Amino acid sequence: MAKSSALPDHLYEQMEVGQRLRNQGYRGRFAPSPTGPLHLGNLCTALVSWLQARLANGAWLLRVDDLDQPRNRVGAVESLQQDLHWLGLEWDGPVVFQSRRRGIYNSFLSALRRQGKLYACRCSRRMLADISAPAGRHLVYPGTCRDLELFWGWHEGRLPSWRLRVSKEFSHTSGDVILRRADGFIAYHLATVVDELTLGISEVVRGEDLLDAMNAQLALINAISERPVIYRHVPLLCDDQGRKLAKREGHAGLDSLRSEGLGPSHVVGWLAASQSLVPFGAELTAGELLSELKKKEGVLKSVLKP
């Protein structure tokens, strides 16, 4: 990897470590937030991500996205680990906690600012809500504050957010990406991209609800690295009303299924069937499902969307 002038030596070394890990073979990850019990949609993504890594004889990491402390729930980290163990989805190495990596996120943020790739933005959520997006499209920030050279510190009782000046190729797909929120929290996109690059993640398999995040993350990767990360997306599970499963809606997790007497093979079979990997009614462990898919080349990849 060619050394980037944007990065001081210690960050360049972190990127080199990530590249060496990536060169050793496939590295995937599952990255839940500890905001409540995992629902079946989360578990389906975990299963498909685990299968993709194991079919490639690769590593599968567990990362806990716990930066947004006010939303975290006591006991959620232990609960999600127990659920993965129960399903037979074992991860490699120690669990990675984003809350313990704030130093490296802030270092990358400072490096990008020193290179002039960031600017202060004082657009409020209300102002952005007034910007209408085309039907069926996510909002692309129009660059309102890009050339204003606004003050970086407190002004009228609030801090600005910090945005990345994206290159022209991303201006219409992601817009300028927030890397530090106005409340001082590191933004999701920055933490995620830094982790993918420094932990050596070669491919991310995640829910289709994060498809809109891909362009913002690719724009940030483009700003700090020459090595792209591959993103693939799992179709969402929906309830009877066609709504995607969500923690805030209280959709079913493993506790309710276990209370009905269902075992891991029932749940793994149902999750696999929901993605057309096996027929409905099949009962098999995660290991047995992996063995079956090894006999059916390309079946899992047909499920995943770019």
Curated annotation (Swiss-Prot):
Residues binding ATP, per UniProt: 247
Keywords tagged on the record: Aminoacyl-tRNA synthetase, ATP-binding, Ligase, Metal-binding, Nucleotide-binding, Zinc
Enzyme class: ligase
Gene3D superfamilies linked to this entry: HUPs
GO MF term list: ATP binding; glutamate-tRNA ligase activity; zinc ion binding
Cofactor dependence: Zn(2+)
Its job: Catalyzes the tRNA-independent activation of glutamate in presence of ATP and the subsequent transfer of glutamate onto a tRNA(Asp). Glutamate is transferred on the 2-amino-5-(4,5-dihydroxy-2-cyclopenten-1-yl) moiety of the queuosine in the wobble position of the QUC anticodon.
Protein family per UniProt: Belongs to the class-I aminoacyl-tRNA synthetase family. GluQ subfamily.
Protein name, entry field: Glutamyl-Q tRNA(Asp) synthetase
Source organism (scientific name): Prochlorococcus marinus (strain MIT 9313)
